[in-house]
Amino acid sequence: MELYSLTIHELRELLKKREVSALEVTKSYLERIKEVEPKIDALITITEDFALQRAKEADEKIKNGEDTALTGIPVIIKDNISTEGIKTTCSSKMLENYIPPYNATVVEKLLEEGVIILGKSNLDEFAMGSSTENSAFKTTKNPWDLSRVPGGSSGGSAAAIAADEAAFALGSDTGGSIRQPASLCGVVGMKPTYGLVSRYGLVAFASSLDQIGPFTKDVTDCAIVLNTIIGHDPKDSTSLKIDKPDYTSYLKEDIKGLRIGVAKEFFGEGIEEGVKETVQESIKVLQDLGAEIIDISIPYVEYALPAYYIIASAEASSNLARYDGIRYGHIAGKYEDLIDMYMVTRSEGFGKEVKRRIMLGTYALSSGYYDAYYKKALKVRTLIKNDFEKAFEKCDVIIGPTSPTVAFKIGERANDPLAMYLADIYTVSVNIAGLPGISIPCGLSDGLPVGLQIIGRHFDEGKILNVAYAFEQANKFNAKPQAIGGAR
């Protein structure tokens, strides 16, 4: 068994017993990256020298008995999360050479724990997309089938974990950008409750929806990472003050008698038959474990997608106004006056999808259309939140498919934005309501991974992880991607 194929808790066991060193673990991952990265293109930056230096420091910590649950564990960070002294591009020409002078709060927390940063992962430009095809630099391939997308926008992070390029990765989720690629790549991906993890240092897309979360190889690892990255941060005005639980303590609780809601709206038109069948089999697994399955309805969830694209695009058009060519980022080479400089800078710096969303958002916020679009979308948001609250009166968690399809072919939806947007049809409502959700692999359809989404009440990550762990132990999904030469 190669070191790079192990989980966080397996690696920590070896590191604690001093059977391996953090340096050996890091070298194992760096070799793995050299082997598979040319095939999958998951990374924008590889920080080899920094990683080796950090590994030596981690070994010192372990030797002195100062290690924690993540000391010596290698991570990959999505390239829209600020890393001091390491390029943070957002996969955009606009920030192609931008090096942040500070770390995001989540990065700071990981570094304090002795985590080793191996590199930064590819994404859809400014996290806008569902396939990682919108990157200005490269298209990431799915390790299960190199002709298919890994999902998005955190496709680089998901593909990296599926291909064993790191023990875990960080992503951001605005409308499904952690859960959908986790589903398509057959890994665990969690979007925590809005406000639970600091957004300080995350390059903003839609500030009322964005949330940072982990990609891991199993549910136990997800709980371990969550323990470290949550917590109040005065630098983020939306960060919440709550008692920090130990999420690993929830994992082994019995789910007998737990009420699991199955919403009919998550099995409607557009879902692939193979995905539907695999998820229905998963529901049966949970029923056999003693959970009570309850049919529920979330009526307004069918309006979540249009409401999401209006709200997210409106916030993006405001957030991206800061890229003007003056303070940092790309600047036009030739221009006639100040207004021309703004226009040329933004025309050159932003890609097609980012421009599309800025235009959509600006239109929705314009005086003649504000009431008809943006205000209406905010009302729909409230209705969706209310629907979830009513549903949670009848059940403890809600489950369904993460994505209506398995990974689709690269280029297949490139010229059809609507088909691309539909990839997030089951995930956006969770962001709109600010709820926590996880995607865990539950089986294969046509040889490609299917994700099971588990949604909980606000701050009920413990219960979500409990259900996910119980399912994982019973289901024993252990298929591995073969397209890159039999990873894991």
From Swiss-Prot:
Gene3D superfamilies: Amidase signature (AS) domain (3.90.1300.10)
One GO biological process term: translation
Catalysed reactions, semicolon-separated: L-glutamyl-tRNA(Gln) + L-glutamine + ATP + H2O = L-glutaminyl-tRNA(Gln) + L-glutamate + ADP + phosphate + H(+)
Example of a GO cellular component annotation carried by this entry: glutamyl-tRNA(Gln) amidotransferase complex
UniProt entry tagged with the keyword Protease: no
Keywords: ATP-binding, Ligase, Nucleotide-binding, Protein biosynthesis
Gene Ontology molecular functions: ATP binding; glutaminyl-tRNA synthase (glutamine-hydrolyzing) activity
Enzyme class: ligase
E.C. number: 6.3.5.7
PROSITE patterns named among the record's database cross-references: AMIDASES
Active site: 78 (charge relay system), 153 (charge relay system), 177 (acyl-ester intermediate)
InterPro entries reported for this sequence: Amidase, Amidase_CS, Amidase_dom, AS_sf, GatA
HAMAP family, per the entry: GatA (MF_00120)
Family membership: Belongs to the amidase family. GatA subfamily.
Function: Allows the formation of correctly charged Gln-tRNA(Gln) through the transamidation of misacylated Glu-tRNA(Gln) in organisms which lack glutaminyl-tRNA synthetase. The reaction takes place in the presence of glutamine and ATP through an activated gamma-phospho-Glu-tRNA(Gln).
Subunit text: Heterotrimer of A, B and C subunits.
Name by which UniProt lists this protein: Glutamyl-tRNA(Gln) amidotransferase subunit A
Gene: gatA
